[in-house]
Amino acid sequence: MPIQVLPPQLANQIAAGEVVERPASVVKELVENSLDAGATRIDIDIERGGAKLIRIRDNGCGIKKDELALALARHATSKIASLDDLEAIISLGFRGEALASISSVSRLTLTSRTSEQQEAWQAYAEGRDMDVTVKPAAHPVGTTLEVLDLFYNTPARRKFMRTEKTEFNHIDEIIRRIALARFDVTINLSHNGKVMRQYRAVAEGGQKERRLGAICGTAFLEQALAIEWQHGDLAMRGWVADPKTMNATLAEIQYCYVNGRMMRDRLINHAIRQACEDKLGADQQPAFVLYLEIDPHQVDVNVHPAKHEVRFHQSRLVHDFIYQGVLSVLQQQAEPSLPLTEDAISPRPIPENRVAAGRNQFAEPAVARQPEAPRYSSGASAPRPTGANYPHAPVYQKQQGALYSKLLDTPAVERKENVAPSAPALDGHSQSFGRVLTIIAPDMALLERDSHIALLALPVAERWLKQVQLTPGTNAACAQPLLIPVRLKVSAEEVAVLNRAKAVLVEMGIEFVVEAHHVTIRAVPLPLRQQNLQNLIPELIGYLAQQTSFDAANTAQWMARHLASDHNLWSMAQAITVLAEVERLYPQLVKAPPGGLLQPVDLHSAMKALKDE
């Protein structure tokens, strides 16, 4: 058979195989188009589970007459126009395939009117070449899409459709997910002429609880713990059910959204499951409704044809962010109410954060700051609610209310004299390497220290920092779960070594499970997170096999010397961060620098030589 260009209808039908899986897929694509058009009301009519009719009507901005034919063409969209747009998608649709694909496997009619037009226009495609016909019609501002006889021309696909009830249940589930994503939109769903669901638009107040309860049930509503978590450009809000009260019904409630897009993401599910695993049974699943907001440049949604999956550029960061957010809420829920004493409130330690000029701006009197607003926005996305809008938030509402009422009856505490709250903060800065002037590539920092100039070897400072982080003690890094556990094959002798050294390794933050011929690394301390564990762990086992006794300090020293550097080419910010951590965790190193770390530079000799010339 010779190579030939496929007819447009056949090409669209092939694309429809990826985009249009069943009637629920059609509903999802069309409703997302309505949301992108700024609709505040969407009416969905279904007949015979979507096999006979799917009608979506909205009050969005509409489509101009001269763009109707393009709307039904393949790879035609108003959502993106360049690669820059593709790399920072904020709309739900962007491929330009949905309408063309749906039109190729059904009898689709598109009727639309914009606010600038006096009349509406209707378009439909037919024939082998999918020629579009446009004619006048009566219609208010907005768009209506009718999909008749789905898969009428692809009998094989139609044969795989399930019963009317099953197909409608899939549609109902899609609408539930969309209704949870957009509280500000009214959505009505009818089946065979009977109204099945009515989700009224709600404001930013407590009415959101009503929609949440209508979709997820009162059982979830009563057990829901509110989450409000933010770090830089990452923000997470929503609800997670108390794991102590989990049952089979609640376990079916697992809804997550990324920038308003409903998602089934294994990374997100794994992070939540890991945060709840101590309180869940082996066969139980967590229940949650979570909204993750991230810089669109940091997430790729152009992964799955139906846009069910995304790819995060910093997946480990996102995983740990979600894990810590969920875990913190669960831990605070388990904590008893804070006891009130008459002791004076101790000053809160101020974290170290050195700047390039050598001044610690965070050691100065702190001023309350408002959270930064996201640096990206979408006109179609719902405004972010505050924590007060979430139902049943015992951590943020019940405890604070109880404490506040107690404070009203608490006698005034006399202010103690001769209290120097700034002393603890100043003590942390008594030892300093000085001011970082510049970086001499690839790994030297030029410092101004006590009116003298010195060179500092950044890899050596980094090695000492990792050593102190690996050494058990008050400053030791705790075990951090791995996103994907590392499984290595080991011999019987190596298994024996690991079992003998297990206490020391666990103390250092390395958690593992030993099997017959394998070891699975489940958690490691912070310095090991970016390392190649496939190579490091066998070397560590070899080192331990040569030891007659196991000492955490010696093991930490060996590991620090064998870890790869996190930086090939150092920057000012990286150097300042590492030096600040060394000053905080190991001030003795600043007071008495070891050999190979710091080298004074004699500028006087150089200046004298220049003057002599």
From Swiss-Prot:
The keyword DNA damage applies. CDD domains: HATPase_MutL-MLH-PMS-like (cd16926), MutL_Trans_MutL (cd03482). One of its GO terms (cellular component) is mismatch repair complex. GO terms for biological process: mismatch repair. Residues 364-393 are annotated as: Disordered. It comes from the Bacteria. One of its GO terms (molecular function) is ATP binding. The keyword Ubl conjugation does not apply. Keywords: DNA damage, DNA repair. SUPFAM superfamilies: ATPase domain of HSP90 chaperone/DNA topoisomerase II/histidine kinase, DNA mismatch repair protein MutL, Ribosomal protein S5 domain 2-like. This protein is involved in the repair of mismatches in DNA. It is required for dam-dependent methyl-directed DNA mismatch repair. May act as a 'molecular matchmaker', a protein that promotes the formation of a stable complex between two or more DNA-binding proteins in an ATP-dependent manner without itself being part of a final effector complex. Belongs to the DNA mismatch repair MutL/HexB family. This is DNA mismatch repair protein MutL. It comes from Enterobacter sp. (strain 638). The gene is mutL.
